[in-house]
Amino acid sequence: MVDQHVTSSAGKPSVVVLGGGIAGIAAAIFLRDQGYPITLVEARRFLGGRVFSFTDEETGVSVDNGQHVFLGCCTYFIQLLKRLGVFQQWYLQPRWRLKVLDRAGKAGLLAAAPLPAPFHLLPALLTYPHVGWGDKVRVLAALVRARFTDRHQPHLEEISFYQWLKQHGQTEAAIAKLWDLVIVPSLNDHAREVSASMGLMIFQEGLLRARHSADVGYAAEGLSPAIGEPARRHLEAAGVQVRLGSPVQRILIDEERVIGVVAASGETITGQLYVSALPPQGLWQALPEPVQGLPFFAGLQRLETSPIVNVHLWYDRPVMEDDFCAFVDSPLQWVFNKSAIMR
């Protein structure tokens, strides 16, 4: 939510950014670059949102709050890492490579060939062992259709990606063992639960546009030292006021204009412009009741989450060679070899 109606006669208007996750960090850096005085307000004692690490009390080992990855097509995130000077603390595959196993231990490999997009996918699809030849032909036909479909058509927001796939001849096996293999880690849900527009976006931008779009990247050290801590140092060095431990309790609105935010401590923080990078529920709860009922904001309360269960296991010996792998026909979706990943 941005109040766009306030101007300042003395230089750029001051901006309060609500939320210190990745979106809030990026917004604060961008606006500070434009010369705006910035105050960044974050509920927790650190920046990074859900991209953080903590020390396990029993082992003393630094543990990430779940495994976070990005793709080569996430150009804005890559730019952010470079701007913070921490890109070298992350790893990005030189080419897309994904090992896929089933319950029986049969392994398949999806990898980008040294061919121009989208033909770089062809060898991997033709040799992928987890779907039959009939499915492979139908998958290739659907990928061609996906590449040339305008994902911004309104009706594609009204149907699920699963429905779009079924309309284009995809079987349950192909959806579970190939399409969802990409959709679940990208959109944090299955094809049945995401719009056709979003599903098409993932395949168009992540797989079909360029040969390196699907290259997988991840932090090579703990998440907090890889982004949250350097982000705070960067922002403070740039003159941004970083207010940690300040949960936003209420957003004050007068005559359809935001005039301040009240922190849980009771302090009122004011600026001339306001940007919300809060989670949907957090934003909705902070709004005055009359504003909560407005059509634009009422939908925030109806948004549902799709939680991820992360299990951290310590072994007394190496148990896998790959940095990570994916699974089909299993409630287990991905396994990451943290000993290999953490440099």
Residue ranges and their predicted role:
Residues V2, G11, W96, S246-R343:
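Mid-domain catalytic core of redox enzymes
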Residues P13-L40:
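N-terminal Rossmann-like FAD-binding beta1-loop-alpha1 element of flavoenzymes
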Residues G19, P94, L244-S246:
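Short loop/edge segments at beta-strand edges and connector loops
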Residues A23, F46, Q281:
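Conserved Rossmann-like nucleotide-cofactor binding loop
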Residues R32-E57:
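Glycine-rich FAD pyrophosphate-binding loop
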Residues G49-G72, L140, R145-F148:
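Glycine-rich active-site loop/strand segments that organize a redox cofactor
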Residues F77-I78, K82-M201:
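Mobile amphipathic helical/loop "lid" adjacent to a hydrophobic cofactor/ligand pocket
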Residues M201-S265, I269:
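Helical element adjacent to the flavin cofactor pocket in flavoenzyme catalytic cores
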